[in-house]
Amino acid sequence: MADGNALPRSSFNRHRDAILDMFGIIIDCDPKTYCYYISNPEVLGDDSIERWLFSTLTVHGVLSDSVAIKGRVVLENVPAGVEFLDTIIRAIKMNKKILMTYQRFGAESYEKVVAPYAVKLFHQRWYLLSHTGHHFATYALDRMLALSLTDEDFEMPADFSPQAYFAEYFGVLTDDTPMAHIVIRAHNWTPNYLRTLPLHTSQHEIATTDHYTDFSFDLRPTADFLGQLLSHGDGIEVLEPTDLRQKMKEMIAENFKRY
């Protein structure tokens, strides 16, 4: 039905084909009940681009129908650098290297030719995972000053997975920090925040009382992960490993000196 009227089969099939093309979602019909269903629901997994696109377009549709209250919908600023996203996506599709002008915080700008392997959205910023010819490097799109396609081809190894590359890390900061089994204690309302928005795919709830909840993680505790823990203030306490607990104490002590 559409606005109370029957939807022509040809229109339905066009919509179904468009959904398949845009989201990779297959809509099949059960010959016994004549009911339609999604035959590959796994594509809507939590980390899939299909789920992200679906959620984004759903929100877009809701807001488009709510122009009358646009002044009552408060959004975050769109991060800089998104104007380069289209060129990067085209380069990934075509397996073409890109030439970019990049400027790190507090440094001079420079030009670099890299092979674009993947893009990642993290905390409202887009990042490019690339290979320089010698090593992997991650670049923030909001620190790119210029970007263009080159005529130079590249080939990403068939066994390389961007998801696997980032799997052991909290965000986009990747280094040789050793893997660790981390146990934290969440106080007050913090456990509810962690349950509804886990910090990492390895997060597990291992103990719960009336006063606190313990969570475990298996990842590389890079600086951005520690910063995330600190952002919860006294709501999070690191229990294990002991060296990480000591490091957190030192970071808190240094921060305390500023006050």
Where on the chain are the PLM-derived regions?
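General beta-strand recognition
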Residues: 35-37, 99, 127-129, 214, ...
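A short alpha-helical element within helix-turn-helix/winged-helix DNA-binding domains
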Residues: 1-3, 119, 241
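Polybasic (Lys/Arg-rich)
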Residues: 167-259
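Bulky hydrophobic/aromatic content
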Residues: 17, 23-24, 28-103
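A structural signal for short hydrophobic beta-strand segments in well-ordered beta-sheet cores
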Residues: 27, 119, 147, 205-206
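N-terminal helix-turn-helix
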Residues: 1-27
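Core beta-strand-centered patch of the WYL/Sm-like small regulatory domain
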Residues: 71-183
